[in-house]
A protein has these predicted regions:
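Radical SAM enzyme core and accessory elements
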Residues: 1-79, 336-476
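Short alpha-helical segments and helix-capping/turn motifs at coil-helix boundaries
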Residues: 21-23, 83-84, 97, 196-197, ...
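A short acidic, helix-capping loop that chelates divalent metal ions and anchors anionic groups
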Residues: 121-123, 219-225, 290-293
Length: 476
């Protein structure tokens, strides 16, 4: 009797990548890899790689914790996920990070932009004017986050390019007056490179502010393909200015398979040598926004492949150092390290997260301490700023026997690697998106998961028409 060439691991819901109708999807193991297999009644079967490491994929399933609920929900459950965003009461996680787009305008025209931003006055996609949002509109969006969160952990100002907004510092001052613990500025770094006085003024808002700096490559050809401009000197000048004022910075690297994935280790080494840099975030491209010519079979670069590249291209981390993030383990992986006396010490050189997240029999006694396990969950959370991560880590280390805690441990001693895998129509997984904790604030005040926003809810998105059809057909 013939047998299948795969193991059937589980079942979820996805969408057809062609018509975006909801379809059932199998999770299959085959030849050491994990696939999402689905069948649309109109467009037939399709299969996409979602992980190339079965062991790590299975490990992710154990890194879950009860979700934190927002104080209020924004929409009722009416049409089913992903057509009720949000947040609706069926969503399993609050907003670890809330993203506010303050402008449609940008001083670059990146080929991979998910937001369709650019320097032209009118969008070629929506045929609507690109504009800066007013201070009143932005305050409305900030207040929507605060209404959901009470005290928001992290708010990120994005765009477009937020630093070209004519009221940029008024926006920063407004945000800092609100109950928000940490503010991120998502930027391409051009203004930071060109205007030292701008950086000095930004530094006056320390602590509690961080630069989320685009940094994709050291190679001109890569930057030309991704960003349309050779930005090497811009990056160098920006980081020099940020170092001058020790302004907390995370490098964010957009990864394209076969283009800049060979630079992962070099970027980490560079980041470790910069006083202002607290970490690196790697984001593989997904089929969204302006991206053209994306082939899901050829170009898919899953989280597990990025994790492996970090391990292969650097000597800083071991496999057990890079672990799933409990609030959204399917999409996020993280490694913490200490920078002490010029040396980098991986966090798991001091503690082993597995021993705390998965309480095993016959293990050390202190792993049974629920408060200790909660402190580990708190540490491995996307809602941390470098300063709050330092505090959380110090509290954790103080609980552990025989672990010396540096007297001067502060946010300058923290270094974090993050892998963020966003979903698109090909690898969309309803089970996973329900745990999404990175949310974009819609102009009407709804907080919507990053993936569903770009797929269904962004003006001009591929799924906008599908969303309207579903809602009309099922209207009460």
């Amino acid at each position: 009797m013939p047998t299948r060439n795969h193991l059937f691991y589980g079942l979820t819901n996805s969408v057809c990548s062609q018509c975006l109708s909801k379809v059932e999807a199998k999770v299959l193991f085959r030849d050491g890899q994990v696939y999402l297999s689905k069948h649309c009644l109109i467009h037939g079967a399709e299969e996409v790689l979602i992980a190339d490491d079965i062991e790590y994929y299975q490990k992710m399933q154990g890194y879950i914790k009860p979700g934190d609920m927002p104080l209020t929900f924004n929409t009722p459950i009416r049409y089913g996920c992903p057509y009720d965003c949000g947040l609706c009461p069926d969503h399993e996680q609050h907003s670890c990070l809330s993203l506010i787009e303050v402008s449609d305008r940008c001083n670059l025209a990146c080929s991979i932009c998910y937001a369709d931003s650019g320097p032209d006055a009118v969008s070629a996609t929506t045929h609507t004017p690109r504009r800066h949002r007013s201070l009143e509109e932005i305050e409305f969006l900030i207040d929507a986050v605060v209404a959901n969160e009470g005290e928001a952990q992290v708010v990120q100002l994005s765009g477009g390019e937020p630093t070209i907004h004519p009221q940029f510092f008024e926006i920063v001052a407004l945000t800092k007056r609100k109950p928000i613990k940490h503010l991120m500025i998502n930027t391409n770094g051009i203004r930071i490179a060109q205007d030292l006085a701008f950086v000095e003024k930004l530094s006056q808002y320390k602590p509690g502010i961080e630069i989320y700096l685009q940094f994709d490559s050291f190679e001109a050809g890569v930057l030309m393909e991704l960003r349309g401009s050779d930005l090497r000197s811009v990056r160098e000048a920006a980081i020099a200015h940020l170092n001058q004022f020790n302004l907390s910075t995370t490098l964010v690297v957009t990864l394209k398979k076969g283009l800049n994935d060979h630079e992962i280790g070099k970027i980490i080494d560079y980041a470790l040598a910069q006083p202002c840099i607290r970490g690196v975030t790697f984001q593989p491209i997904q089929a969204a926004g302006r991206l053209e010519g994306y082939d899901a079979r050829r170009d898919r670069y899953p989280l597990t492949a990025v994790r492996r590249a970090i391990l292969e291209q650097t000597s800083h981390f071991k496999p057990e150092d890079i672990v799933p993030v409990p609030c959204h383990p399917d999409a996020l992986a993280m490694a913490y390290a200490l920078k002490v006396n010029g040396k980098m010490i991986p966090l798991t050189g001091l503690i082993n997260p597995d021993e705390f997240v998965n309480v095993m029999p016959n293990s050390v006694l202190y792993e049974q301490d629920e408060s200790l396990k909660q402190k580990l969950f708190d540490l491995f959370s996307t809602s941390h700023s470098p300063r709050s991560a330092a505090t959380s880590l110090k509290q954790l280390l103080c609980c552990l026997p025989l672990v010396p805690v540096p007297d001067t441990l502060d946010y300058e001693n923290i270094f974090r690697i993050m892998i963020v895998q966003f979903m698109d129509a090909y690898n969309f997984d309803v089970k996973s998106v329900k745990r999404s904790c990175i949310h974009i604030v819609h102009p009407d005040g709804r907080l919507i998961p990053f993936e569903t926003y770009n797929l269904f809810y962004r003006e001009g998105s591929a799924g906008q028409a599908k969303l309207k059809d579903v809602q009309q057909v099922n209207a009460p």
